[in-house]
Amino acid sequence: MSVKMAVGAVTLCACVAQAWQVPSWDARITEQGAVKERIGKTWCGHVQGMCVTSNAMYFSYHNQILKTDWYGRSLAYAVTTPHGGDICYWNGRVYTGDVYVPEEKGERARARISVYDAETLQPIKRRFLDEWNGAADGITCLDGVIYLGMGRVSPPGNKCWYGKYDAETLQPIGKPFVVDHGYDSTHGSQNLATDGTYFYSGHYCEDENAKTPCFIVMDRDFKVVGRHVFGCRQGFDVVPGGKDGAVRFIYCTTINWMSPKAQPQLPVMALVQFAELKDGKIEDITRHCIFPKPLKR
């Protein structure tokens, strides 16, 4: 994911400079204004990725893309063909890294990049990555270049593939390359974001309950410079507001989304939360509920 913002004189993510503030973090979405379990007539699945701009949040689901304001009120949505992945914003467009899952048996799944108008979510273009026999998921944009998480080398493995693509033509820039994250992940880069100086990559790990450093910080040459424990596997982005060298993130997690019996004391909902990376540690700094679903079906 990438974010359209500027802090002071530093323009992040090579997007249009625009100073902005995150709306009240205490905002709580009521059931009346919340996004329901189904958008249109189609089951949308769990959140795959998210990105934000100064006036909107974008969420990628299994087969939907949703745009809301900063209070969770729906602004636009698009139905897509599964399986959706991560999402990022750049230059008036949103991009998703997907895996097309064919309905016909015998046809192989294919990685692709899809592009939508950020205002309306109308599709603009898509490109199947036929040069790559694997998945696509984590995605972000910097200086007009799409950076794409393209899966692991072997299952399980600590080496994952990344690729670079022109944001206008969607044509590849060079060949995919491998990064050794130093630990085993199960699906490669699930979510990817940048602040213009570093890339941040979130992963699923073999042992989900262990305190595995599944959040990787890389420099612009994709050299690993940090590893952290951070549960952001359903989407995150970088937002302004960090002070004294801190990097601030917004991220999304779901509760009871796929199984309402997982935590019966809680409603089915997603949480939009905030965290900061400072002095080598990531800490949750605040949270608010968004998209609570009615328990009555």
Protein language model features and the residues they cover:
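Beta-propeller blade signature
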Residues: 109-119, 159-168, 212-221, 264-281, ...
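Loop/turn-rich, solvent-exposed surfaces of beta-rich toroidal or solenoidal domains
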Residues: 181-217
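Short, solvent-exposed loop/turn segments at conserved positions within beta-propeller repeat blades
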Residues: 59-60, 103-111, 154-160, 207-212, ...
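Blade-loop segments of beta-propeller domains
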Residues: 72-111
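Short coil/turn segments that connect the beta-strands within blades of beta-propeller domains
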Residues: 54-55, 91-92, 143-145, 196-197, ...
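Beta-strand-rich domains and repeat architectures in extracellular enzymes and scaffolds
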Residues: 35-63, 83-86
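A short beta-strand motif characteristic of beta-propeller blades
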Residues: 31-41, 71-79, 122-129, 171-183, ...
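Repeated scaffold domains used in trafficking and secretory/extracellular systems
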Residues: 44-49, 81-91, 131-141, 184-192, ...
